[in-house]
A protein has these predicted regions:
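Long, charge-dense tracts
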Residues: 1-119, 124
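Active-site nucleophile-adjacent alpha helix/oxyanion-hole segment immediately C-terminal to the catalytic cysteine
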Residues: 131-202
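Active-site-proximal segments of catalytic enzyme domains
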Residues: 204-219
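An acidic intrinsically disordered interaction segment
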Residues: 114-142
């Protein structure tokens, strides 16, 4: 575990998408980042077992998860919270969400690490005279036993090995559908496997994207 100021986030969130996330979090007044190493992400672990574990040069199976807070605090402050200090409530109220960093680089674009399951607090619901309406899903995270909860819509970047853009879009759509219609949550590779039961011209993994028939087959 490491606690760093938000100003130092560029070494962890880089590339075009990482910079966008950093700008978004700056708008939310992010001040502190807690870096959780060796995080086991369920979605990535399933994708790892289905594809990466059998690759010639298999990557690490653990990810890195970044937790963002609007409150400024030190590592000592966090340790006190872990011991049940009253500062726990302050941490919960300042929680802005998390970003999972996969141990896989996107060498086709900018060489940055792929962004895994990410859930960040939305912008304020009002902006001057305008009212914003967001499609959200309850997102929970546990940091060394401390529970955090925000309402957001999780997303991640496409992973061309197991989940091209259509797969990732389907993965995002499952979150609200799981509440409305009790649709089971699947990992990106599981979505790809289910969708490509419709015969195609290419092998299932690595994924080369879906045809319209594949999208229809999934739903």
């Amino acid at each position: 575990m490491e606690v760093v100021p938000f100003n130092n986030i560029s070494s962890y969130l880089n590339g075009n998408i990482g910079k966008y996330l950093a700008d978004y979090l700056a708008e939310l007044q992010a001040s502190t980042v807690v870096i959780e190493e060796n995080y086991v992400d369920r979605n990535f672990l399933i994708d790892y077992a289905k594809f990466y574990a059998r690759s010639f040069s298999a990557p690490e199976r653990f990810t890195r998860r970044l937790h963002f807070f609007s409150k400024k605090f030190s590592e000592l402050h966090l340790k006190n919270a872990l011991e049940g200090n009253k500062s726990l409530k302050e941490l919960s109220e300042s929680y802005l969400g998390f970003v999972v960093i996969k141990p896989i680089k996107d060498n086709d674009i900018d060489g940055s690490f792929l962004i895994g399951r990410t859930a960040l607090k939305t912008y304020p619901k009002t902006d001057d005279q305008d009212t914003r309406t967001f499609l959200t899903h309850p997102c929970e995270a546990s940091l060394y036993g401390i529970p955090f909860k925000i309402n957001s819509l999780p997303f991640q970047t496409q992973d061309k090995a197991v989940a091209a853009c259509a797969t990732t879009a389907l993965w995002v759509s499952l979150y609200p559908l799981s509440i409305l219609f009790q649709v089971p949550m699947l990992s990106p590779s599981e979505i790809t496997e289910k969708a490509v039961t419709f015969p195609g011209e290419q092998r299932n993994l690595p994924s080369f994207g879906f045809k319209s028939a594949s999208n229809g087959k999934f739903y």
